[in-house]
Amino acid sequence: MKSPALQSLSMAGLQLMTPASSPMGPFFGLPWQQEAIHDNIYTPRKYQVELLEAALDHNTIVCLNTGSGKTFIAVLLTKELSYQIRGDFNKNGKRTVFLVNSANQVAQQVSAVRTHSDLKVGEYSSLEVTESWTKEKWSQEFSKHQVLVMTCHVALTVLRNEYLSLSNINLLVFDECHLAIQDHPYREIMKICEDYPSCPRILGLTASILNGKCDPAELEEKIKKLEKILKSNAETATDLVVLDRYTSQPCEIVVDCGPYTDKSGLYGRLLRELDEALHFLNDCNISVHSKERDSTLISKQILSDCRAVLVVLGPWCADKVAGMMVRELQKYIKHEQEELHRKFLLFTDTFLRKIHALCEEHFSPASLDLKFVTPKVIKLLEILRKYKPYERQQFESVEWYNNRNQDNYVSWSDSEDDDEDEEIEEKEKPETNFPSPFTNILCGIIFVERRYTAVVLNRLIKEAGKQDPELAYISSNFITGHGIGKNQPRNKQMEVEFRKQEEVLRKFRAHETNLLIATSIVEEGVDIPKCNLVVRFDLPTEYRSYVQSKGRARAPISNYIMLADTDKIKSFEEDLKTYKAIEKILRNKCSKSVDTSETETEPIVDDDDVFPPYVLRTDENSPRVTINTAIGHINRYCARLPSDPFTHLAPKCKTRELPDHTFYSTLYLPINSPLRASIVGPPMSCARLAERVVALICCEKLHKIGELDDHLMPVGKETVKYEEELDLHDEEETSVPGRPGSTKRRQCYPKAIPECLRDSYPKPDQPCYLYVIGMVLTTPLPDELNFRRRKLYPPEDTTRCFGILTAKPIPQIPHFPVYTRSGEVTISIELKKSGFTLSLQMLELITRLHQYIFSHILRLEKPALEFKPTEADSAYCVLPLNIVDDSSTLDIDFKFMEDIEKSEARTGIPSTQYTKEMPFIFKLEDYQDAVIIPRYRNFDQPHRFYVADVYTDLTPLSKFPSPEYETFAEYYKTKYNLDLTNLNQPLLDVDHTSSRLNLLTPRHLNQKGKALPLSSAEKRKAKWESLQNKQILVPELCAIHPIPASLWRKAVCLPSILYRLHCLLTAEELRAQTATDAGVGVKSLPADFRYPNLDFGWKKSIDSKSFISIPSSSLVENENYCKHSTIVVPENAAHQGANRTSSAEKHDQMSVSYRTLLDESPSKLQIDVSAELAAINGVSYNKNLANGNCDLVNRDFCQGNQLNYCRQEIPVQPTTSYPIQNLYSSENQPKPSNECTLLSNKYLDGNANRSTSDGCPKMTVTTSTSTALNLSKDKVDSEKNTSSGYSSKTLGPNPGLILQALTLSNASDGFNLERLEMLGDSFLKHAITTYLFCTYPDAHEGRLSYMRSKKVSNCNLYRLGKKKGLPSRMVVSIFDPPVNWLPPGYIVNQDKSNTDKWEKEETTKENLLANGKLDYDDDDEEDEDLMWRLPKEETDFEDDFLEYDQEHIKFIDSMLMGSGAFVKKISLSHFSTTDSNYEWKAPKKSSLGNVPFSSDFDDFDYSSWDAMCYLDPSKAVEEDDFVVGFWNPSEENCGVDAGKQSISYDLHTEQCIADKSIADCVEALLGCYLTSCGERAAQLFLCSLGLKVLPVIKKTDWESTLCATGENCNSEQKNLSPNSVSACIVNSEPSLYKDLEYGCLKIPPRCMFDHPDAEKTLNHLISGFENFEKKINYSFKNKAYLLQAFTHASYHYNTITDCYQRLEFLGDAILDYLITKHLYEDPRQHSPGVLTDLRSALVNNTIFASLAVKYDYHKYFKAVSPELFHVIDDFVQFQMEKNEMQGMDSELRRSEEDEEKEEDIEVPKAMGDIFESLAGAIYMDSGMSLEMVWQVYYPMMRPLIEKFSANVPRSPVRELLEMEPETAKFSPAERTYDGKVRVTVEVVGKGKFKGVGRSYRIAKSAAARRALRSLKANQPQVPNS
């Protein structure tokens, strides 16, 4: 569409070409096709870029608009030519000179050059100062500085006196060069240049060549003159000539609106009134002192605004504006102090009300009456009606919009934007939001002159839309240029305005509004989409305004309509002619101008004649590129290359004329395209053809290298080339709902059974193996946890113990702890004898006893389980052993088994009757080690008690503790009608036998190993010391059980021992399997080797708040342990008195040293505590105190109040399980049993502190108070306990560590996989990244990252993990023997098992009791049913509850239930206790979506508890101990779609796991191999899983690689000691993949392109970089890497290397891994939650960008992108002001005070990118050495790592969810027009907060930050309850 001649249209026939009516169909030119792809010309580049090209090529005068990039061009030109000015001045080095007109402009230029380059800049502004300088002084200046910024006067002096000769200047920049036309120093300077033979390059900058009105002829004259004076060509920026030179011009129309007929006379009346009032104000003769405000000023302003609205828009609008102004005035009147001023304001107020009254006589203000608006308005509405979309289009267009295939495209959602910023009258409803069926077609701007016109016109259009269905589609808004300019000083008022304006613009960009009414400010510099309608409501008064507004109409079909009043139309047509002429002149000056008409006139060439098309196949409709379509293909290809939001990559085409008047073109593609060489086309007859032909040739090349697909479209990132990488698998078909790999999808898996326990039931006369279960009390329970003052019973004191009899050998596994009432007991499984046989009846006896243990002692039998040892999957015998016949060895205790068979009390209650004749006789020895059964109650399931003490001073006649009964005898008589025959017998103090069978973790610690708060320990001790609270029984009324108490105590440990054994064997099996598959480790362990003990890593992992680091003195302890852990302490050792005293003395000294210690500074404490503890925990301690002599220590330890002092200073969390315990008891905390896995298990951390890098040994010895020793592989001493020098490095990881990697946090065990998973996750990313980088040197970043994301996706990891059989081996739910443990020899009876199937409705109360389920927790020991409480306590069921303090009852079941994916109702009737003072709290509604810490709550696997719990954060007491309340999953909102079917599975043999948990497990195992065996092993492990991260080499190449290993094997493999062949071939074991051996990655060969003068270019490009190398302390061997790391994709001057994207991809993964590894190895042992937070605080773009700026990266950055230039500029300024970093905030903020308003400053992603790319460059340059990278980066990062570790920054999102877990809801993302994302967070009842950012994550955190700010601001008003 050529720009038609001016059409002056009368009102009648206004024909507009609107998109809807366009012949090209409704979608041609929809406004949101943001960048239309041009087909016949190359995509135009940014005008600043073109101007820079010109300036590099020849002397140039750049004519620009104000502020649009003069500095950009000047600074970049200086940088491009900087290689010429780095030389020594005295040896002919050159200098760059910047000339400015006045002194105050000097600083500005100086700072720009300093910010963006490392050049040294001298500034000379004052003539007075410099006049006196001598030549020498100047020479010094010139030597010191490379760029000289001077005022023109100084420069003139310097040149005239020849202090600096022109031959030493390489570039002369004239700012405001138009001054050279007049008499000005610039003119003089140019004269000097004229006479000089070699003149420097000249750059003139001017913004004011067009000021105000200007005659075209004059303008042309002026430009010519300037060109002559400056010896340059003038180039204008395209923003002065409308638009990109290429796109079609808008259709320009001038509309004559006709006169206004004032039928009602209202208009005239109002006009008169207003004129009179204004006249009056002007007449008021008030003396105004210059200092004072003019009292009439405001009034005049208001009335003249009102008059303007009346004239332009008519009475209806004048009425509206009067109403608005009255409201404004009220504010002024209220605040006005001065009488006179007030009077005028009141006058105005009255006057406006009068106007309103006048209008009301004529029309009702509520509805719009078109009689009362001006013809302009009517015309405008008419135009708008033309844009009404066709109805049918609604759907297509919305559809089309939402189906754009962009990966990052976020779907629209109904954004609930209430327009608070408009003055909407209450009755108006806010505008309807996107997506309305229409919004899509119109995208228009109406330009008006005054602010008020904009406001009222907007109101009018809204009103019209309500009344006229034709206009209903319009959704308008207004914007008045308040403080929109980028760099104006900001004040609060403006901030508010600014935010509003931003929001209006955002909506317009997002097409939520389709019409914008704007004042002229929007003409300039504001980023607005391409409009298809621009209306000038008021005519443009000068060229600039005309061009700017016209330039907004950029849609392919657009109208530029100027509304003129009849009287103005003549004069305006004149103006318009002038504007057109000026435009033409400027267009000729336009850089690279192409006469646009050529495009239109030139016929489409019949391509085949000129140049044959490129055809793929010969058939008819084969895809082809012709000479006419080629350019479009190239443009499309470039647009698809990876780039940042600021850079739109475009091809560059240069066309030159040959002497014979033919033309040839050279085409350069963007530098991140694999096709790097420039393409030269053949000579053609005209330039246009030359350009097309070269494009065609280029298409052919691109297709051949696989960059265009077979339809000749750009290949996406899912490229065919890399198929093999993606290993496209068919996802298995399952009926399971949910996306594979996500947490939402769960499946059931059988629980694994270790091979060695499968079918290993001994058979008669077949050889057997007998193992003894050794039990040694290694850490007795400390005093302050021993509330009952119970005696401790070390298991090693009695010889009778349990053994395991099997038919297969059991591999060696580490010793492990269980936690009994006596403390920590270390369990070992030792082979006693093998190869012997047993007869049938012996086996039968053993089998009967085995069943007896599980069914009667442990009461684990229930209807669902049947004892069938021959059919059971896991079958072996548990049997008692003892020292037989004086020999000192243990053997099977047959005698004991036979005795039990005979005993009467074996299963029931014996019926012995005592009478007066045969009274009961008390024998003390019978009761010393006895379990007794009361014979008078609970006959079906008698209670069993341990005898704790024999009270010889009490008899049945002693006084009964409670007043109801006189004596014990009376109590029994009254209550049970029992007579005693022996009244002298002593009484027994008894303890319940334990019903808590899960002894895997200590019950006084939560999973962090942090003491649970003890509710007022003092109170408890008192309670247990008074007789009232003891259970006292009479021997005569009890039967003695045949099993002695000592053995019973061991039997209680059996479920935990066997369960742990089972898990460790599964882990050991996995280790052996990996040894086979991956060749890492050995298949079967050496006979003399045992791994160090399983350890929870607690003793040293101190709670994250206190961070006491463990100093080296803790080594002592480990050495002691080494001795200890292999010796089973002989029983008698503990009884040697001598030792005892010595240890007591030792402790005395110790307590003394403690006191002195505490008087010193707390920091000292940090050091010595562990040393002293090490002393306590040494061997002697364990031996001697095993006997209960531990009071001493602890009392000494906590004497006095010195510890309280310590408590205020540093909150030390207990480092061991004994000292300082009651410090932490907070008064009213509930005391969970250890099964209560509060959510803190999310933080659990049991992993020992291991270093992952093999290279540098770090001090990572872990201390531990149990015998458990944690092997740290770098520490040689720690291997003492392994008799010969094996280490986990050669043998494979400790099964304990593997078990940790298999244990989910829901298992509530002492450890879980979370820390390892994080380490594995970052190593995985690193390994895959490095592999892809090295294997595909041609793939650009987009593709690499697509391949990476496919490989590391949870879905892929889940698949590999499943293939490897991990799900069965994982530990996913809490160990709860009565519910989900299958004892050996048992099978699940399918018919009866439904009680344990999840689907079954209620389990009845009886059933619960029968299974012993409610006897849960060891707390029942605390609240045994005291006989003398309430008569109704007979129902043993309530016993457990009655005695709880109220705060204990907060939860009973204390188990964290899984995500409620079975919608199983829970009847609270199980729990209805009759105790009136206890009430159940009704379950709160919990919306699981946002529970603290766990964003995906579904990770919890279902544990087996019938009462489900949720966290009630409102009761959160301390950092992360939560109170658990009941949560009834059948409520709505529980995070589960109600429709989800419940999964039914058997708890004993199956487990249900979310896919994502399996992926996590794979990562954790990787972390486990990495920490234990090193990086190479971890890579091999990945390969064996099926994730290729190493190249495969053929068998034959192996030898050759071996020789090379020493020199170039990358550093990760160096430590495999190349000298020993076996060490290097890690796969020395026969590998599963016989034919696969893995080699080492090779560094991609070329990093520089072959290029004739590559070396020279390289030196030019990196001149000055040596300073940077000094700064980072690393010197590059291959400088090309250095250049590449700093080259942005837009920097096309670099023709020799790639851009930084690939290196950034590599560096990103390297830094992530190095930082994660560093944090993981931190001796402070951060918990998983803290690790995650630290990692995200440190590995993010903001931090990287800030560091990059701090270390001057930006000064070396090479990019040609104006927007990026400005963002970096802003950011650098901001950093300088701030000089202080914030964590987590991805968008940094300007000022701290009043943060509500200040604008988030944008962090240039490119800065973070080069920070990463440099890391990648160092990695490649140093031969893949991670150490080298860390050596350079750690010093830079260290301050931040330290700062954050000491004070962990929380992500705003997490903080908000922790603050408002129930009420904060995040909306889905909404896309804004400019490609940003908006997220709204609603905090129910407290408001909605929006955040906008470049990604969902950034937006979400911005929203959360706003919400937090607001919540925190409002907090104090809440009264503290």
UniProtKB/Swiss-Prot annotation:
Q: Say which family it is in.
A: Belongs to the helicase family. Dicer subfamily.
Composition bias of kind Acidic residues appears in 414-425
Where do the PAZ domain residues begin and end?
Answer: 895-1042
**Record InterPro entries:** DEAD/DEAH_box_helicase_dom, Dicer_dimer_sf, Dicer_dimerisation_dom, DICER_DSRM, Dicer_PBD, Dicer_platform, dsRBD_dom, Helicase_ATP-bd
What are the DRBM domain coordinates in residue numbering?
Answer: 1848-1913
Top-level class of the enzyme under EC nomenclature: hydrolase
Which stretches does the entry tag as region Disordered? 409-433, 727-746, 1270-1289, 1782-1801
**Subunit info?**
Component of the RISC loading complex (RLC), or micro-RNA (miRNA) loading complex (miRLC), which is composed of DICER1, AGO2 and TARBP2; DICER1 and TARBP2 are required to process precursor miRNAs (pre-miRNAs) to mature miRNAs and then load them onto AGO2. Note that the trimeric RLC/miRLC is also referred to as RISC.
Domain (Helicase ATP-binding): residue spans on this chain: 51-227
Question: Which purpose does this protein serve, as stated in its record?
Answer: Double-stranded RNA (dsRNA) endoribonuclease playing a central role in short dsRNA-mediated post-transcriptional gene silencing. Cleaves naturally occurring long dsRNAs and short hairpin pre-microRNAs (miRNA) into fragments of twenty-one to twenty-three nucleotides with 3' overhang of two nucleotides, producing respectively short interfering RNAs (siRNA) and mature microRNAs. SiRNAs and miRNAs serve as guide to direct the RNA-induced silencing complex (RISC) to complementary RNAs to degrade them or prevent their translation.
> Site annotation (Important for activity): which residues?
K1805
GO terms classed as biological process:
apoptotic DNA fragmentation; global gene silencing by mRNA cleavage; pre-miRNA processing; siRNA processing
Query: What's the protein here called?
Result: Endoribonuclease Dicer
